[in-house]
Amino acid sequence: MKSMEEMMQAAQQAAENIQNQMNDMQVKLDSIEVEGAAGGGLVTVRATAKGRILGVNIDDSLMKLEEKHMVEDLVTAAFNDARDKADRVSAEQMKEMQGSMGLPPGFNLPGMG
């Protein structure tokens, strides 16, 4: 049987491993790109799975003063579409990482959804 000190060291090592995996996952999520679109692709927003916006593209046909409000609405919709996709990818990646840790289904670590 393990001593209390050995069990504490094992718990500390497990916590460090989890922290390292979480840090690795944050780096991975920042490297995965998603694209949100609105207006049939007239406005697109590229973002990382971590939610960092990489770019916005607005079709030239929308660059008219009378289209200003529509462009604003489309940019908002494209941003929200990209954010939703980033959230889904992030949740999938975290679930995959959690599964690789051998944790029981439904057991959620802080920061893992």
Where are these regions (language model features)?
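N-terminal intrinsically disordered, cationic/polar leader segments
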Residues: A37-V56
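Conserved acidic
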Residues: S3, E67-L74
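Long amphipathic alpha-helical segments used for membrane anchoring, targeting, substrate engagement
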Residues: M1-S31, E35, K85-G113
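Small cofactor-carrier domains centered on a conserved lysine used for covalent cofactor attachment
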Residues: D30-E33, A37, G41-L42, K64, ...
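Stable alpha-helical structural segments in soluble proteins, enriched in small hydrophobic residues
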Residues: L74, A78-V89
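A short interface-forming secondary-structure element
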Residues: V56-K68
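Residue-level signature of catalytic and energy-coupling elements of molecular machines
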Residues: A11, G51, V75
